Amino acid sequence: MSINPILDASSAIKVHTLAASFALTLGPFIFTPKARGKLHKFLGYIWILAMATTAISSFFIYGFKLIWVFSPIHFLSIFILFGLCRAFWYIRNGNVIGHARTMLGMYWYGVLAAGIFTLLPGRMLNRALFPEAPWLGYLFIACGALLIIRHIRRESAGLVG
């Protein structure tokens, strides 16, 4: 493992990576069924800040242009920013289920699903995490895809959120 690819990246990528890593790490503490009360609320505000920072910083990253300067990550960032507002609106209006589903959706698809693609060989995180064996990125992508498929099946069966 080498931190050099991250240190050599632009400031926007550094901020984006740090904020996304923070959101990824906080998720399990916030989204457990027993996470309620003041700690949940406090960590939730921090998670919202991390997600907003991740989304906003992506608008300064221009690696994969699809339409003009925009890439799929930019469209995901718009989705995340609207999702954060929606989740906040839900909880302010007492819709706990809508809030939980929106927040979990952003975690599963905005953090985990999007995050596994950063492990593709040639990408910065792949070079940082697997400099000697870039193919390991595919292994982590496969494991992440299996987790997401499991989540989708559980969600469609009504077992989550």
Residue ranges of predicted features:
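Alpha-helical membrane insertion/targeting regions
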Residues: M1-G161
